[in-house]
């Protein structure tokens, strides 16, 4: 058995090395209607047949040799490929009589990918559909979406749109297991995924082979169906609670959200999902990709809230600079009114120019909070364009509760989106902003206010259409801002996206970051860093951890080392009154933050995220932690003792790469020894430093 295991490992790592060496490909069959798109890890064959239409003939995981289109039984059909309603007419890709093949082409795609486009023309309806299939080097993933064009002379209304429909499974139904909620929570195999199910993991409980289904539709618009009792996958928009509807004018094209399906195998080296998914999402789905280096961000919201002043800010800037932070953000309170860039001169009597100068003198960049669609009735745009207001089901203007009182909600499916984009873009240019926290109610909020817009005369023809159109409006605003300021970091908060603690691929397609939560951390006994880590761990398989800004950990709350180590697992973010930190504590932060920045520049730790200990529900009586590692095995670990009485814990990582590694305690500065990848796979005991409840470990070759 040992010989077989070693041979399997050799063959597996050879496949991975070939995958990294070989380019991706699209191969076209002799008749021009058969295409194979893939790399050395995964390969999908798509065909067009006049009788069967467009369909997936095979989809192989080349690491194992499994064709996941056949594994559940030869009696199954391939699936519809895509489907939607156009007015009352149902159209599915696999209905051969409904389509005429028009053309196919291949093009290069960043990063290191190929794109296959297949264009079809409906026979009975003036509609063209283009199906897009993308594959990227070294990722066992095929990404898919469609575009629908109205070739007719009258408006067409789309609904019930599935952009990926395929009978794909890693095994027969009686051996399948499903994990939803970012791939972390067990569910039944006949399952409907919604807002918190941007990624759903389906695996074979006998072989460990599985697939991760990633739906890039935004917020509540997403729906993922694991059909029947293990009878295939549909990646789609919602049809009932947040129903998708989209009108297409003559000549107009609608491009759907994207689907990504990744293949993985538990415990099989870098084919394990904890390597596959973080590598793919951080390199392909993150807006800034592999070039991204996460800044250390400070934000004034807690404890100062709207009481932040010039004097307090200047003191905080000095402390933040000494700590080695990169972005100093003034949250709500700097502006005179929501929806206007005028400064609140009662709090910042000299404006923000001197604040910007002070921040940049300390080697940082300024960040600001802005509301997107919630604006003050005092603003010019509110007075001059009441027709752009969102309206409720009774036709009344919508208002939303904020820390500044009730504010009007503007509909982003109107020309207001252009006004909002210009306002934020002007603000970025005026103050050389590195980061913008874009906040508050859009489609709806996270606190029970009703969604959507019922107004007449907007770009939506119905309430249902307003839902998707408002998300499109957010994308329009961010696209316009990035066009003017490509290097800025846009944070689209959970309140803007409309759900507590939500983050998804639709959000990451529109922005860089997500202020995920406001964890209370203001006093002894508050929820604090353990709850922040709970949010992190449950999302860390599906979501690039550095896109999550988990407020509101306060840097001055003891134990400060727990706040620091927790921040290293996500997008590093601090709040708090930095003036309460002693100079020695500020210097301590600075030393550790400089260490982390150096590590992050030298080691791509975004390639793998591994929760440790009692991670699925961290508790006071048990330990938890995480490892962030490159595919070469270098990186860092954070171990949290909590209130357990443990002096040491065993760290075991079943897919740790081969090699010899030097491990150093960042907390004490001492080298703990050299360890092999095999030792990490079997388990290593690490002691907590006597003076800390936290251990930070650096792992280098």
What are these regions (language model features)?
Residues 616-658, 692, 696-698:
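Carbohydrate-binding surface patches
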Residues 21-38, 42, 55-233, 242, ...:
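Polysaccharide-binding surfaces and accessory modules of carbohydrate-active proteins
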Residues 673-701:
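C-terminal beta-strand-rich structural cap/linker in extracellular carbohydrate-active enzymes
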Residues 41, 146, 251, 298, ...:
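Conserved, mostly hydrophobic/aromatic
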